[in-house]
Swiss-Prot record:
PROSITE patterns: IGP_DEHYDRATASE_1
EC number in record: 3.1.3.15, 4.2.1.19
Protein name: Histidine biosynthesis bifunctional protein HisB
GO BP terms in the entry: L-histidine biosynthetic process
Lineage: Bacteria, Pseudomonadati, Pseudomonadota, Gammaproteobacteria, Alteromonadales
Species of origin: Pseudoalteromonas atlantica (strain T6c / ATCC BAA-1087)
Primary gene name: hisB
Length: 358
């Protein structure tokens, strides 16, 4: 996710945020203004979790004699004032005033209302949703390439929607293809299912499994690299793809520990201190007793951690003592996994930064 991409909820108005008047389907008086149950606390909860709110509504014939603008404005403005009084802010209110027979490009499920969001790259497609009570809302979501959620006061109310959105697994998938490597990586930070790792380098597979096991997440990784030359591109590009996937899965980083520290001791004394700060840096201290372990060059170990720090935005301090080269390298991957486990663990929705962003 780039800095400009955001998790956005595109929310229908009538029948979703407020009750749709059952007789004439027009919210044109204050007497008809009735909020859907629990919409206020749930929108507050979702907003605090980092979701941006955008209202998207079809209003048939708005501005015509059948639905004068002044009749629309009074209850609509009161609704917006009430939302604002509870700290609920909509970044945009997007309204199509046309009838279906006008064949406009902005009426849902057409994309006219949300065109700027799509063209300007504002949407994080993995964490954005359309919420509405009609099939046209679900069709809009499909046309946008995001997930649609069908609101229903009885079958799928606002608390149920909140549960679905806030419990969404932190999953990310990255495909990286270059002239040297073809990599497919998928991570699930909230699953501890058995990982599947195939890089073509047995010892490297074992090390990556240490990160996933001690990091407490599921990793599925396949690498097809130019191993007939050497291990450089496969190790480097794996680190870049894995770092990108981890960063993507963390989303806006709300609720994470951010910092990690681990100091396990076996034959080798390894130490890792890390900060998911989006300010990449590596300080690495190790003197390996051999040039290779298995089919992996030990000179690629610091390069792996440098690359993953760059891709994930880590400030990373990593060291190990003298010892058997296999145990030295393994201690580094283990200690990194243990520190990462602390840093990515989620507890609440607060952003762990006084700057308001990470």
């Amino acid at each position: 996710m780039s800095l400009s991409q955001q998790a956005i909820l595109f929310i229908d108005r009538d029948g979703t945020l407020v009750e749709e008047p059952p007789i004439d389907k027009q919210l044109d008086t204050l007497a008809k203004l009735v909020f859907e149950p629990m919409v206020m606390p749930v929108l507050t909860q979702l907003q605090n979790a980092g979701f941006r709110l955008v209202m998207v509504s079809n209003q048939d014939g708005l501005g015509t004699d059948s639905f004068p603008q002044v009749d629309f404005d009074l209850p609509h403005n009161k609704m917006m004032d009430i939302f604002a009084s509870q700290g609920i802010v909509f970044d945009d209110v997007l309204i199509c005033p046309h009838f279906p027979e006008d064949n406009c490009t902005c009426r849902k499920p057409n994309l006219g209302l949300v065109k700027d969001y799509l063209q300007q790259g504002k949407i994080d497609f993995t964490r954005s949703f359309v919420i509405g009570d009609r099939e046209t809302d679900i069709q809009l979501a499909q046309n946008m390439g995001i997930v649609g959620i069908r609101y229903d006061r009885d079958a799928k109310d606002w608390p149920a929607i909140a549960k679905q959105l806030l419990a969404s697994s932190r999953i990310a998938e990255v495909v990286r293809k270059t002239s040297e490597t073809d990599i497919h990586v998928k991570v699930d930070l909230d699953s501890q299912a058995k990982s599947t790792i195939e890089t073509g380098i047995g010892f490297f597979d074992h090390m990556l499994d240490q990160i996933a096991t001690h990091g407490g997440f599921e990793l599925n990784l396949r690498v097809d690299g130019d191993l007939h030359i050497d291990d450089h591109h496969s190790v480097e590009d794996t680190a870049l793809a894995l770092g990108e996937a981890l960063k993507k899965a963390l989303g806006d980083k709300r609720g994470i520990g951010r910092f990690g520290f681990a100091l396990p001791m076996d034959e080798c004394r390894a130490e890792c201190i890390l900060d998911i700060s989006n300010r990449p840096h590596l300080k690495f201290e190790a003197e390996f007793s051999r040039d290779t372990v298995g089919e992996m060059a030990t000179e690629m170990v610091p390069h792996f951690f440098y690359s993953i720090a760059q891709a994930m935005g880590l400030s990373l301090h990593l060291s190990t003592s003298e010892g058997n080269a296999h145990h030295q390298v393994e201690s580094l991957f283990k200690v990194f996994g243990r520190a990462l486990r602390q840093a990515i663990q989620k507890n609440g929705e607060a952003l762990p930064s006084s700057k308001g962003t990470l």
